[in-house]
Amino acid sequence: MRLDKYLAETAQCTRSEAKTLLNRGRVTVNGAVCKKGETQLREGDSVAVDGAPLAYQQFVYLMLNKPEGVVSASTDKRDTTVVDLIGDAYPRRELFPAGRLDKTSTGFVLLTDDGGFAHEILAPKRHVSKTYTVVIDTPLTEEMRRGFVEGVTLADGTALSPAEVEALTPDGLTVKVRLRQGVYHQIKRMFGVYGAGVNALHRDAIGGLALDPALAPGQWRELSAEEVTAITTGA
């Protein structure tokens, strides 16, 4: 890979900005100042800007704690999007949410620029689970629990895959739901079959990776390689 391209991708700058860094002697390759953007890097080469090493990332994976009122989209003419919350941290990346949460819902949203990985975790055949804490307006019943386990048939005739539901509070109004399917407004429609409404919905985990409790609503952080793997291996 050319040095100027490497700088643009790892330092999150434009090619012209990378050229400026090079011309000012701020870039080193294996400890030696290099001003030629056309320099071809070899495996194992160490690149630094102002002495700070740069690490190449082919893709970015972010965990975001989505607040209420934000839409799960890359762009929107009216509302703040999950990508808007990232700001200018990745100007050269085309980030998008892998899956969605309703505007009123909160919790774990995965943002990435890796289309292949997004397809992998969303594909029905992969069965990557999503876990939610849900507040309903009618106590959980054995009929609901059994129906979820057997697979709910929605009002429009759509037959859903089996899911898991359990009460988290003695009154049965706060429950945990685990799905391996992604149908529009699925949880609300599932409870609607039993005449129950959903007052709040929070995504706690995707696959084997739980939302970091240190992230306040609207905050985000990068995932480690191990965490990315946990999403699919712990599904």
Regions found by a protein language model. Name each.
Residues M1-A235:
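Basic, flexible Lys/Arg- and Gly-enriched helix-loop patches that mediate nucleic-acid binding at interfaces
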